[in-house]
Regions:
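Nucleic-acid nuclease catalytic cores
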Residues: 94-185, 189-194
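Metal-dependent nuclease catalytic cores that hydrolyze phosphodiester bonds in DNA/RNA
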Residues: 1-102
């Protein structure tokens, strides 16, 4: 259920990557209206990026306040030399059959001669949680990749800015997946016991 950000497999509700990582992020100091505005902006930018990848974006449909983010996305595509054929399926909901969690990785893509997962962000500041998030997305994609096909190897966050610039951050900490699994175990324990 995209509207509620819920994932079900055979009627069973699975925790999302976002839900699993929620205890690691404290947004209590940010006004709810500001958070909601940022959330809506992020959704709109993700839709624009997805449509741009698929060459389905109608320029006139982009709200003026989102133009800089789209400009940043296109600058990244230009600077990195990534073409349409270099992208996998964007925003494809997946679940992990072994670990029982789900999520929607933003963009699998071929970059620097290797498959990677790219998570698009519109936040003002970098977050260490993004490494954990991309580790979970990498594992989701690889768990759903048929044998004999290329696996995702690298993880990136792409922070798009309103002024049309971007920052690409590679996540290389090998512990990120283990930390995510620890969070998942705690989330599952709480669901059974509290």
């Amino acid at each position: 259920d995209a509207e509620r950000h819920e994932y079900r497999v055979d009627g069973v509700l699975l925790p999302s990557v976002t839900q699993v990582l929620k205890p690691l992020q404290d947004f209590s100091m940010i006004a709810p209206a500001v958070l909601e505005h940022a959330r809506q902006r992020g959704i709109a930018v993700h839709i624009a990026v997805q449509l741009d990848i698929c060459n389905d974006l109608v320029e006139e449909s982009v709200a003026p306040e989102l133009a800089g983010y789209l400009q940043a996305w296109r600058a990244f595509r230009h600077d990195s030399g990534i073409h349409e054929a270099d992208f996998g399926d964007p925003e494809k909901p997946l679940y992990h059959p072994l670990y029982g969690f789900a999520g929607t990785p933003d963009v699998p893509f071929f970059f620097k001669k290797r498959w990677a997962v790219l998570d698009v962000k519109t936040a003002d500041a970098l977050s260490p949680v993004w490494g954990l998030q991309t580790a979970a997305y990498l594992e989701l994609i690889n768990a759903n990749t048929p044998k004999g096909h290329h696996k995702v190897v690298d993880r990136y966050s792409l922070r798009l800015r309103e002024n049309g610039t971007y920052r690409l951050e590679q996540h290389t900490d090998k512990n990120d997946w283990q930390v995510f699994l620890s969070c998942l175990t705690i989330h599952q324990w709480k669901g059974k016991n509290l």
